[in-house]
UniProtKB/Swiss-Prot annotation:
It catalyses: L-seryl-[protein] + ATP = O-phospho-L-seryl-[protein] + ADP + H(+); L-threonyl-[protein] + ATP = O-phospho-L-threonyl-[protein] + ADP + H(+). CDD domains: STKc_MAPKKK (cd06606). SUPFAM superfamilies: Protein kinase-like (PK-like). The modification Phosphoserine is found at S312. Binds to MKK3. This is Mitogen-activated protein kinase kinase kinase 17. Its EC number is 2.7.11.25. The keyword DNA damage does not apply.
Amino acid sequence: MEWTRGRILGRGSTATVYAAAGHNSDEILAVKSSEVHRSEFLQREAKILSSLSSPYVIGYRGSETKRESNGVVMYNLLMEYAPYGTLTDAAAKDGGRVDETRVVKYTRDILKGLEYIHSKGIVHCDVKGSNVVISEKGEAKIADFGCAKRVDPVFESPVMGTPAFMAPEVARGEKQGKESDIWAVGCTMIEMVTGSPPWTKADSREDPVSVLYRVGYSSETPELPCLLAEEAKDFLEKCLKREANERWTATQLLNHPFLTTKPDIEPVLVPGLISNSPTSVTDQTFWRSVEEEEEEETEEIQKDSRDLDRLSLWGCYSERIGRLKCVGGLDGTRCDMEGGDWIMVRARCEGTMISGSQKELIISENVLVGEL
């Protein structure tokens, strides 16, 4: 498959996401690229994504290794392009919150996606609003499998993800299974309803070390939004049991009255063309340092991100958080978007149909032609 690379959609510490256009079709693609020597996580993501096919999981379109004109060898992962952005984008567009009808719709879609990937023996490990995208047909699709792994009853790989969405057993470094994804669904629903992840407030920046400790070692569960109906609160309680074996499965939750008594609706997709948002769909590496003096240390940590598999999560909390920055940004803050230190890490093209002129705009700034 030949394709033309276009403008940047997102950028992380080890990979960059571009819009791209196939030469033999009108399809717009998202291409995630990384230098081969830094592409361990990306190659693992491609391997997992290539084994999945569901209306509720971002579509895999291929992968390749290619030497660029500057001599650098790149690994490219080709994926379905989601023109309506992420759940986080959707909430921001509506004043920071998603209305109840769409909360039901998107939660149902996420659970259908998880039911499918769990049936394949895969755990996502980083479910959150910025890792769920809205397709051109309005479905919520699970994306960004950079932290995903296959369930292995013998070998426990290091835990990954975003602290504010981690289940207690994950925050303690014990295990990360299907039950952990269910906890994250509850956290994502809270994010949709309130505009902020649990454990945080929209107008404050809580130390991620404190968040991780509260999640793992307190007896607390995330505060349930008071505006929710009792049915919705009961649904969240089934997701947010501190004991993993007490949480409902994706299949059980799909049969909860909160989801079954509400009609399946066609979401209203707001028309437009391009809008930018400081969130990442396909890379969990966007992270603002907790303190300015940590920036130099963070750069060194990012260079060592490939050594994450050797990290003992029973080590110092500060070290654990530093390493997690490389694979899972904490989206628990709403930073000043007018500041000069933001970079554009997500672009949306809205509208269910892509015209020729729109396609040219999306993939403008072409830099090379790839061949798959």
